[in-house]
């Protein structure tokens, strides 16, 4: 599936120099490139994966060999420079700088440094690392070497112990749960049960770990599924390709680290947590590229964390479906804020990209989060989890603003505890000035038979698993574009679902529906829900509608004053045309301008000062610049 070109919202992209076409598949995203960040001041040490030596003094002319050994020598104020190349290590950082003299680990300017927790031979010597499997499937290979030290409990209960990527494109390899899936030629969803092996279903290039022989198996056979977003047609012999193969170790662990800065590094090569941070504080990651991993990032009991100008990529390949990941492989979250005490607090995730996975970001137990100017794109299940019990803490002081969300099956997600017990909730989550462009869906299901079609699931604004009590939501000054009718014709593109036992406020939002008109089903009169000043519009059917659009809603009992100042009108945005991918949500005048209602001044609003006169409706007030998200949209260093 090709993402829309949101040309007039400034989506910051990472540029890469022209290169030969990969032997595997075209990259899903621009590959990381070297940074031009200038050298810093203060004591400096160097490490080089090719020319380094453990017996050296760590100077620029005599660098050390490994990062893990080098970081143990660092003192407050030191900077460790990583020269270009791949460091096949699992690095543990357990050092502390000070507020005035932090410790910095970074790449040398102009050189791309990669910390790879994976297995070296599959990248550097693939011809000698793989052997054909006797009696196996066509194109099936296994590792020449045994890996008997992989921990059985490292799979997180999913039955997947190995993950990987094509090294030339970083397109993910499927982590197979079932041996029969790797070996079958069947590519249709005709298995007897979603999680029963049956005769198997091959879902794309991938890896599988054989616990009897302790060998890693790989198969890179082509896919030929009609109607799915893409198919694999690249090299099928793993001896001719470099593969990143991750097992049960992280690329980088921060253990009780403090006042540490990580800059301009690439982290990859793990089937568990690519980046793990535990019990740390005052940590900043800037310009980092992280490839999942299950998950890509895990952070527990850590305060004053910043992740800025960075990209985090998940494990979904172009041919990965929600079903293939959820039922026949691994279905990891991308980023997890662990909920065990002590509670993590005071985080900022800004100007980042979070892309290409099954589930996205779990932030349901943090105290103090500024999540802004990020791009969230291409998750075939849930995007941002705001309720995911069990948890030792509830969210507090969560601000999600000025983000762009696209191609997510469920943008905002809420889940019930496994034992279905009641979950506590926090004081409320603030979501404002975001753009949810949900016109494009995600890949849901593989066809069941040759006559069937691949199922592309429409993106939706919100949803839940079970019947949890949703976090209180303060949702205001957002712009939401949905492809079609909301579930049960709910008002606000489903934003009035799950209102029992919680609080919901919806003010000054634009809800646009491409096909049909927005829903009007509202909660009962006893729910603590207030909505007002919202603009609703149907792109195709709105212009021809006659009469009182809200008559149906007015005829049904609902909360007092619900939608009293809502409008049904063309929002008159700079560029929003049916069938065209480009998007510019700046107001042209009229429509959303001065049409909103007053929002409590104690609610945060990053663009309040730019909204002159009466409140405008939607993410951008009249005269505001384009929404800018992603790494290169960040303020200059």
Residue spans for each PLM region:
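Positively charged n-region of N-terminal signal peptides that target proteins for export
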Residues: 1-4
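Bacterial N-terminal signal peptides
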Residues: 6-16
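Extracellular beta-helix/beta-solenoid repeat scaffolds
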Residues: 101, 106, 110, 115, ...
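Extracellular polysaccharide-degrading/modifying enzymes targeting complex plant/algal/animal polysaccharides
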Residues: 23-270, 276, 319-329, 585-589, ...
């Amino acid at each position: 599936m090709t993402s829309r070109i949101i040309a007039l919202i400034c989506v910051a992209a990472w540029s890469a120099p022209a290169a030969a076409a990969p032997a595997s598949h075209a990259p899903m995203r621009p590959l990381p490139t070297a940074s031009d960040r200038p050298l810093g001041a203060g004591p400096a040490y160097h490490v080089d994966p090719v020319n380094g030596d453990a017996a050296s003094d760590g100077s620029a002319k005599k660098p050390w060999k490994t990062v893990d050994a080098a970081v143990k020598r660092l003192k407050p104020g030191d900077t460790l420079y990583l020269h270009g190349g791949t460091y096949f290590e699992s690095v543990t950082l357990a050092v502390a700088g000070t507020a005035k003299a932090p410790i910095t680990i970074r790449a040398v300017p102009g050189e791309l440094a990669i910390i790879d927790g994976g297995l070296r031979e599959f990248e550097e010597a693939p011809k000698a690392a793989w052997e054909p499997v006797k009696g196996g499937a066509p194109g099936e290979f296994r590792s020449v070497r045994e890996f008997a030290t992989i921990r059985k409990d490292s799979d997180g209960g999913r039955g997947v112990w190995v993950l990987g990527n094509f090294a030339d494109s970083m397109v993910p390899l499927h982590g197979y749960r079932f041996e029969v899936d790797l070996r079958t030629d069947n590519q249709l969803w005709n298995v007897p049960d979603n999680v029963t092996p049956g005769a198997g279903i091959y879902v794309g290039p991938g890896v599988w770990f054989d616990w009897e022989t302790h060998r890693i198996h790989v198969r890179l056979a082509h896919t030929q599924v009609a109607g799915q977003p893409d198919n694999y047609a690249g090299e099928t012999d793993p001896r001719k390709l470099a593969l990143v193969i991750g097992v049960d170790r992280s690329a980088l662990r921060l253990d009780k680290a403090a006042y540490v800065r990580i800059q301009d590094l690439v982290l990859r090569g793990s089937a568990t947590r690519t980046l793990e941070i535990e019990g740390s504080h005052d940590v900043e990651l800037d310009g980092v590229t992280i490839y999942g991993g299950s998950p890509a990032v895990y952070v527990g009991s850590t305060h004053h964390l910043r992740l800025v100008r960075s990209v985090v990529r998940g494990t979904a390949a172009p041919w990965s479906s929600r079903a293939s990941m959820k039922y026949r492989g691994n279905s990891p979250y991308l980023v997890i804020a662990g909920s065990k005490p002590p509670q993590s607090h005071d985080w900022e995730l800004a100007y980042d990209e979070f892309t290409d996975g099954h589930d996205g970001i779990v932030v349901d137990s943090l105290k103090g989060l500024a999540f802004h100017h990020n791009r969230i794109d291409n998750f075939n299940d849930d995007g941002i989890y705001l309720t995911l019990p069990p948890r030792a803490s509830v969210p507090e002081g969560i601000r999600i603003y000025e983000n762009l969300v696209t191609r997510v099956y469920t943008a905002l997600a809420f889940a019930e505890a496994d034992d279905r017990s009641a979950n506590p909730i926090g004081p409320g989550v603030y979501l404002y000035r975001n753009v949810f462009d949900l016109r494009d869906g995600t890949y849901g299901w593989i066809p069941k038979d040759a006559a069937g079609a691949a199922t592309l699931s429409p993106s939706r604004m919100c949803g839940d698993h079970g019947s949890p009590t949703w976090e209180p939501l303060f949702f205001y000054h957002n712009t939401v574009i949905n492809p079609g009718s909301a579930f049960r014709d709910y008002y606000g593109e489903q934003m009035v679902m799950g209102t029992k036992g919680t609080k919901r406020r919806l003010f000054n939002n634009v809800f646009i529906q491409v096909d049909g008109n927005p829903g009007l089903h509202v909660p009962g009169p006893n729910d603590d829900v207030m909505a007002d000043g919202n603009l609703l519009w149907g792109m195709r059917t709105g212009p021809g509608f006659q009469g009182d659009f809200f008559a149906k809603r007015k005829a049904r009992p609902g909360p007092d004053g619900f939608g009293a100042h809502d409008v049904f009108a063309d929002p008159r945005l700079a560029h929003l045309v049916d069938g065209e991918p480009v998007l510019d949500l700046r107001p042209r005048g009229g429509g959303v301008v001065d049409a909103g209602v007053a929002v409590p001044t104690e609610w945060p609003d990053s663009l309040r000062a730019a909204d002159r006169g009466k409140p405008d409706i939607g993410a951008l007030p009249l005269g505001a610049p384009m929404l800018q998200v992603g790494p290169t949209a960040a303020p200059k260093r």
